[in-house]
């Protein structure tokens, strides 16, 4: 249910912003598999050396490219709802990817809004490394974006307090509030 509301809310907000002449890109992330993939298999084949780092394959998805009109991306939003698509979350690397994409843009003002339903989690990575590795990495990426760039970063946590990560953060307990809170957060930034 949260991903359905997120897809609908994002679609509506993207259409509205596009009508106002604002370029919008919609990105998503997950892992390709549960509990590791080829990276984990490779690590096991090599006798499980210590501190292996990430042990899962990333899946970064461009639902709507900033230079494409929303009508060309309409069916991509349906992909968000695909059964079995969403698995584990390696938030730090996903945020780095989104940040690299947005800083390469020509627009003067850049706002990156994160919608999160939990902390970074990847069972294979966390069970084979320091248990807070993904948390620490996310915090370091956020710090770079917030302190050393002109990108304005905001986050909305769905049933999860994201203020322990992001400076500009709000938590909602009811996913039905998402569209309203996304809109309010953007208005605050303008």
Predicted regions and their residues:
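Acidic, glycine-rich A-domain
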Residues: 1-190
């Amino acid at each position: 249910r949260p991903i359905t509301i997120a897809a609908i809310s994002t679609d509506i907000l993207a259409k509205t912003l596009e009508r106002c002449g604002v370029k919008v890109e919609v990105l998503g992330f997950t892992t390709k598999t549960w509990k590791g993939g080829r990276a984990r298999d490779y690590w096991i084949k090599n006798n499980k050396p210590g501190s292996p780092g990430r042990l899962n394959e990333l899946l970064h998805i461009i639902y709507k490219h900033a230079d494409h009109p929303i009508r060309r991306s309409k069916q991509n939003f349906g992909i968000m709802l695909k059964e079995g698509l969403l698995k584990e979350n390696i938030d730090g690397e996903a945020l780095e990817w989104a940040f690299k994409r947005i800083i390469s843009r020509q627009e003067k003002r850049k706002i990156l809004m994160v919608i999160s339903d939990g902390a970074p989690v990847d069972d294979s990575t966390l069970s084979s490394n320091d248990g807070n590795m993904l948390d620490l990495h996310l915090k370091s990426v956020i710090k770079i974006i917030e302190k050393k760039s002109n990108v304005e970063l905001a986050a909305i946590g769905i049933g999860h307090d994201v203020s322990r990560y992001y400076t500009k953060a709000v938590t909602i307990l009811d996913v039905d509030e998402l569209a309203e809170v996304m809109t309010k957060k953007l208005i605050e930034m303008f």
